[in-house]
Amino acid sequence: MNQEHTPVLINLLATARYDRMPEVPIQFITVGKLFYRGPEDAQIQYVESQQDEETGEIMNSDISLTFSKDKITIQRQGDFSNTMVFSNGKRFEGVYHTPYGEMDMAVYTREAACRIGSGDGSLHLKYQLSIQGNYTSTNELHLEYKTDGSKKGVRKGIKQ
């Protein structure tokens, strides 16, 4: 993408709820790039790092979040790659590419909302995830971003 971008600070909280298991929250703060694509259309890019539980190796994924008032798309490129599209009340089917093989996946969006501001913004998702045709989890993702010029701070803890 050859558009000009704005550096942003990103605070992301993701929670997965599995049957008969405790909630699994993940929160991190990172830096990224914000691309304004229109008054109600933006894209954020950042790198996500996670440690492989078996090998201890750090794996990086390039994340691209494209969001508008009607749709949020998450594209992940790296060792684990996929595309997920979220729109209220709709189901999206795709493929989850892993080093161990490919798996069919589907998401059913229960909530998808975003706010695009000139110096800050947020997006919120609540969805059900199925892998290989089986219900896997109910997930929630809340992301806040701010530019250096924003007077508002990114909250260190995001209330659910």
Where do the protein language model's features map onto the residues?
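A short acidic/small-residue loop/turn micro-motif
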Residues: L143-Y145
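N-terminal intrinsically disordered, cationic/polar leader segments
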Residues: M1-E93, H97-H124, Q128-S130, N134-Y135, ...
